[in-house]
């Protein structure tokens, strides 16, 4: 339908997008979704090529070891790039601030998980629950270590043999741990279609937000506490 003159005025400016008007609330910006998607693909590529290098059956099946090594090295080196580029986004910086803060409600969430308490209200969470914050902290710490040890293995002239041997040990075992943690992260995502839809489209249904992230859902109706 053709807009009438003046339809771009104050009323149009305050009209919410159709998704929000249909009972959905905005969860992630386009920049955040791009960072997540790009980082995920790079990390999956890195893990897949690592498997091809370390599992003999896969190495024999895939072949072309030099190409696999090259793809592994460059995909690993590029993993931090999407996040660094995304820091230009105010929404991403705000979410990083939320991920970096642990509050009393996060400790309550962890206690409820430990007791397997699923009662309503037993697991209060802001925009990110305590599990997501721990996962983000783990990845944020693991990626620089993997990058540093990988560079020592790649450029053999950077350090003596003893250092390179230690770097290889750390790199290999940390890679295995990352693979296990990533598998758990993906399993949780596969079990929650609405969470995946939120990362894909940027918005989620309000009832889901109220059930999974009640403190954040409440804050969407008033000025938000950045600590949540």
Q: What is each stretch, according to the model?
A:
Residues 1-228:
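Membrane-embedded alpha-helical bundles that constitute the cytochrome b-like, heme-associated redox core
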């Amino acid at each position: 339908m053709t807009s009438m003159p003046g339809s771009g005025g104050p009323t149009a400016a305050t009209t919410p997008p159709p998704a929000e008007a249909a009972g959905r609330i905005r969860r992630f910006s386009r920049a955040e979704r791009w960072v997540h998607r790009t980082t995920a693909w790079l990390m999956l590529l890195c893990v897949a090529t690592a498997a091809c290098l370390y599992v003999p059956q896969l190495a024999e099946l895939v072949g072309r070891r030099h190409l696999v090594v090259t793809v592994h090295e460059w995909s690993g080196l590029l993993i931090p790039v999407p996040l660094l580029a995304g820091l230009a986004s105010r929404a991403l910086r705000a979410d990083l601030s939320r991920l970096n803060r642990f509050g009393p409600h996060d400790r309550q969430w962890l206690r409820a998980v430990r007791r397997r308490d699923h009662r309503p209200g037993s697991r209060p969470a802001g925009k990110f629950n305590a599990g997501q914050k721990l996962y983000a902290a783990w990845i944020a710490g693991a990626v620089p270590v993997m990058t540093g040890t990988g560079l020592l293995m790649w450029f053999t002239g950077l350090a003596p043999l003893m250092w390179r041997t230690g770097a290889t040990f750390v790199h290999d075992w940390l890679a295995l741990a990352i693979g296990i943690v990533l598998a758990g992260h993906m399993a949780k995502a596969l079990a929650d279609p609405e969470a995946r839809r939120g990362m894909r489209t940027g918005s989620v249904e309000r009832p889901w937000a109220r059930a999974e992230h009640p403190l954040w859902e409440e804050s969407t109706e008033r000025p938000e506490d950045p600590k949540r």
